[in-house]
Structure formats: C-alpha cells, structure tokens
C-alpha cells in the first residue's frame, strides 16, 4: 500500500464517514452561520452536503483536500441559497 493510498479518505466506508461528519459538522455549521443566520437552513444545507458525499462515495487524497472541499462547498451552497431566496422574495414582492 502506498503512502497516498493510506491517506486517501473514502466516504463509502460508514465508519470513516461518521468520523468525518462528527469532526467537521460543528465547525462547518459555525462557518455557514456567518452567511445564513438561520440554524435550520444551515443544518439542512450541511445535511444535503454530507448526503451527497455519502451517495457518491467520494474519495479525497488527504485531509487538507477534504477540508478545502467541505468549506468551499458550504460557502457555495450558502451563496446559492441566498441568491435563490432573494429571487423568491423578489417574485413574491411583484405580486
């Protein structure tokens, strides 16, 4: 087994998935809350992100790549939510 294979993070492994979920959820929640101050929405966005990781069985080369991916994904998901919410509010205001 090579060094790269030892570092690889495989989200199709249930134990590894649970460990990473527990390790990152609180920090990602705090990070997302800086964009969206609604705890329920933030938790939904994070849940969706982790469900996608689980369903796809994502693999990451190492912890740094995983961390960067998670934070970038949370940021993008928050910005998408904000954009969509503004559009929805704008359409409702037109009526």
Can you say where each PLM-predicted feature lies in the sequence?
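N-terminal module of bacterial RNA polymerase sigma factors
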Residues: 1-27, 34
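Sigma70-family region 2
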Residues: 10, 50-65, 84-86
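Conserved catalytic core of Hanks-type protein kinase domains
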Residues: 23, 35, 72-73, 81
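Structural recognition of an alpha-helix C-terminal capping motif at a helix-to-coil junction
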Residues: 30, 44-51, 64-76
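Arg/Lys-rich amphipathic alpha helix in sigma70-family domain 2
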Residues: 75-92
